[in-house]
Amino acid sequence: MKIDLAHFTLRQMMEMEACTRCGECIETCPTYAEVRNEEIHPLQKIAQTKSFWKADHLGLLARLFGIRPATEGERSTYGRGVYQCTLCARCHVVCPVQIDTRPLWISMREQLVGWGLYPEIFDTLRDRVTNQHNIAGED
């Protein structure tokens, strides 16, 4: 299960490389402030995404640098962090290199859907819309 780079624009990949890991985004993230879980904060999401793409696409070079493919558990943890984000974009506002985070988080979610890692409620909502033509499940 490789990361599909088609979900990310060239600009997004360059922005992730440009992240200075300054931590400004951590202090402003309302979700992280509430739950204090590292998988949620922007630095971690960017670091994990970069790690996945390097392990999946650098081949021998990745092995030389000790980058190993992600386990299913690591991908699942990553997914929880990506989906707990509210997409408020406060991290973008304070980012010194102006990483456009909201579209980046959406691209990460697209990748997770490709892996089949998304909140179960999405299946319920899809089924309700398909069968009852609304998310409330009412006829």
Residue ranges, per PLM feature:
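Iron-sulfur-cluster electron-transfer modules
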Residues: 6-16, 46, 50-139
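Long, charged N-terminal interaction/targeting segments
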Residues: 1-38
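Membrane-interface helix-loop junction between the first two transmembrane segments
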Residues: 33-49
